[in-house]
């Protein structure tokens, strides 16, 4: 009889004596998590006239790692058991923030794995200014309608409107500028109840009086009721 030793790596799975010429029966390899037994190498059909060492080996199993975003499959990869997992880069979606991957193990287990992520919609800041004055500042959800505020009344001026207001909120903060135009009012000069001259004057402008009219044999009294600057009325 001779010795038949069956090993996997340095581990002896079985060691037994077998009579010369008898059939050599290999043992069943023990189960190993995440691996498949690849078989015994060069097992003789019958026992030779010397001791033998028969080597066996395992192959590493691959398992499926599936990434899902908002319930839909994003990517699927095959990963060897026990491999350290490097997460897929976060997907990008304009106007949204990705939550990160949930359920991602550090190393690949001996089973298929599904990891999930979700997008949440962002809000951005919409600031409405006239000059240096902030009229309104508010958070607006990406893609929602941008509603401009009503501009405050300003004496002697007409609001000219907000410039370049987007229809819907973009994926960034915005500053929207507004402006006023100066109103014109009518300055009417009357002499002895009859209209002498009428001019259009911007609100707030310093008024320079019309030269005194002349009439032979008469003295002009001067202009009464003439303001220093043009008020917000005729």
What are these regions (language model features)?
Residues 9, 14, 53, 86, ...:
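Residues marking helix boundaries in flexible regions
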């Amino acid at each position: 009889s001779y010795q038949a030793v069956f090993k996997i790596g340095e581990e002896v799975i079985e060691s037994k004596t077998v009579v010369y010429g008898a059939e050599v029966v290999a043992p069943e390899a023990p189960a190993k998590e995440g691996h498949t037994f690849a078989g015994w190498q060069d097992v003789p059909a019958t026992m030779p006239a010397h001791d033998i060492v028969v080597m066996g080996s395992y192959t590493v199993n691959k398992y499926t790692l599936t990434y899902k975003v908002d319930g839909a499959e994003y990517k699927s990869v095959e990963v060897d058991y026990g491999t350290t997992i490097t997460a897929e880069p976060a997907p990008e979606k304009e106007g949204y923030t990705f939550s990160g991957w949930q359920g991602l193990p550090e190393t690949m287990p001996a089973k298929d794995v599904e990891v999930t992520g979700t997008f949440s919609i962002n809000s951005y800041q919409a600031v409405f200014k006239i000059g240096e004055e902030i009229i309104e500042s508010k958070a607006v959800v990406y893609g929602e309608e941008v509603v401009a505020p009503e501009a405050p009344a300003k004496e002697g001026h007409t609001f000219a409107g907000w410039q370049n207001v987007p229809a819907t909120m973009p994926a960034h903060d915005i500053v929207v500028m507004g402006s006023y135009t100066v109103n014109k009012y009518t300055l009417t000069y009357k002499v002895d109840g009859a209209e002498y001259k009428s001019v259009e004057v911007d609100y707030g402008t310093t008024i320079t009086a019309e030269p005194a009219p002349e009439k032979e044999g008469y003295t002009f009294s001067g202009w009464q009721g003439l303001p220093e600057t043009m008020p917000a009325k005729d």
